[in-house]
Amino acid sequence: MADKKIRIGINGFGRIGRLVARVVLQRDDVELVAVNDPFITTEYMTYMFKYDSVHGQWKHNELKIKDEKTLLFGEKPVTVFGIRNPEDIPWAEAGADYVVESTGVFTDKDKAAAHLKGGAKKVVISAPSKDAPMFVVGVNEHEYKSDLDIVSNASCTTNCLAPLAKVINDRFGIVEGLMTTVHSITATQKTVDGPSMKDWRGGRAASFNIIPSSTGAAKAVGKVLPALNGKLTGMSFRVPTVDVSVVDLTVRLEKAATYDEIKKAIKEESEGKLKGILGYTEDDVVSTDFVGDNRSSIFDAKAGIALSDKFVKLVSWYDNEWGYSSRVVDLIVHMSKA
């Protein structure tokens, strides 16, 4: 298996679908073989892939349309489907072993299992799932067993919070904690005030409001780190930035520690086991400094603060699009070796 590239198909060519495609096409250990999206033409798909308001133009190889069913990335053909029902997508025909389910619609096990009928061997849901096992790379991916066919990569915020919470809990113990994420705009929000029956505040104009919102990200940490189950919860503020978000984790510690000791522990882990997942900075950074950062969580040593040696606020940045999309691919690579 060492030399054989892992063949990936993507269902849903939205923000995460397109960025997972970008990540895959820039790596040597994986290969993009198929994309399915019933709502866009092949021509429009190339345009959406080529131009990106946040991450810039695609510059890695020329993108051409071979025919209605095939895109060429340089010389590499990628099959395009436009099928609504996931059961009917012929993944096996295209050679896709792993399917990234990034429509945001088929997030539970039953719905995601439809991809297996078309010949996919494994499905990774790029969203939290109420019943599929959730994995956060750097935290609990070692618990993946090869008989699991449908898994979730959790949420971008859980991917930011969990590595940080793991380090703090392993080193100092967490009694309890509250998280706030100051989160960039996502596709579910509205450009101007509009109807949003499930979340009235969420229907307000995204580009000129700070919008309080719910998030399951902190509670989900308890699913990937059972030791923290019931110890964390949190909420979100949606703010008018297009990408990059920041987690503010306020925790009560079991073991007394100075802020410097906490910084040292996080720095050590960021250079050790969690290298490439958890970052550490002492620079005077702001959100745009992290656009295109492929780490899950970058601890901002200067932004955090301790009230006492057992009560501390920790701040960690994440590119909620690019970092997360990078982890989706990392998880697939990990699964292929299990």
Swiss-Prot record:
According to its UniProt record, what is one Pfam family this protein matches? Gp_dh_N
EC number(s) on record? Answer: 1.2.1.12
User: What is its subcellular localisation?
Assistant: Cytoplasm; Nucleus
What does this chain do? Key enzyme in glycolysis that catalyzes the first step of the pathway by converting D-glyceraldehyde 3-phosphate (G3P) into 3-phospho-D-glyceroyl phosphate. Essential for the maintenance of cellular ATP levels and carbohydrate metabolism. Required for full fertility. Involved in response to oxidative stress by mediating plant responses to abscisic acid (ABA) and water deficits through the activation of PLDDELTA and production of phosphatidic acid (PA), a multifunctional stress signaling lipid in plants.
Task: Please list the reactions this protein catalyses.
Answer: D-glyceraldehyde 3-phosphate + phosphate + NAD(+) = (2R)-3-phospho-glyceroyl phosphate + NADH + H(+)
Site Activates thiol group during catalysis: give positions. H183
Q: What is this protein called?
A: Glyceraldehyde-3-phosphate dehydrogenase GAPC1, cytosolic
According to the UniProt record, one GO cellular component term is:
cytosol
Additional free-text comment from the UniProt record: Plants contain three types of GAPDH: NAD-dependent cytosolic forms which participate in glycolysis, NAD-dependent chloroplastic forms which participate in plastidic glycolysis and NADP-dependent chloroplastic forms which participate in the photosynthetic reductive pentose phosphate pathway (Calvin-Benson cycle). All the forms are encoded by distinct genes.
Q: Where, per the database record, does this protein carry S-glutathionyl cysteine?
A: C156
Q: What is the lineage of its organism?
A: Eukaryota, Viridiplantae, Streptophyta, Embryophyta, Tracheophyta
- Effect of gene knockout: Delayed growth, small siliques with defects in fertility, and alterations of seed and fruit development. Reduced respiratory rates, pyruvate levels and Krebs cycle intermediates. Increased reactive oxygen species levels. The double mutant gapc1 gapc2 has an impaired ability to enhance heat tolerance of seedlings and to promote the expression of heat-inducible genes.
User: What tissues has this protein been observed in?
Assistant: Expressed in leaves, stems and siliques and at lower levels in roots and flowers.
Q: Which residues form the active site?
A: C156
Report the family membership: Belongs to the glyceraldehyde-3-phosphate dehydrogenase family.
Matching entries from CDD domains are given as:
GAPDH_I_C, GAPDH_I_N
Q: Name one GO biological process term.
A: response to sucrose
**PTM characteristics:** S-glutathionylation at Cys-156 in the presence of oxidized glutathione (GSSG). S-nitrosylation in the presence of S-nitrosoglutathione (GSNO) or sodium nitroprusside (SNP). These reactions may be both a protective mechanism against irreversible oxidation and a mean to store inhibited enzyme in a recoverable form. Glutathionylation is reversed by both glutaredoxins and thioredoxins in vitro.
Look up what happens after changing C156S: Loss of activity. Loss of glutathionylation
Q: In which pathway does it act?
A: Carbohydrate degradation; glycolysis; pyruvate from D-glyceraldehyde 3-phosphate: step 1/5
Q: Which Gene3D superfamilies match?
A: Dihydrodipicolinate Reductase, domain 2, NAD(P)-binding Rossmann-like Domain
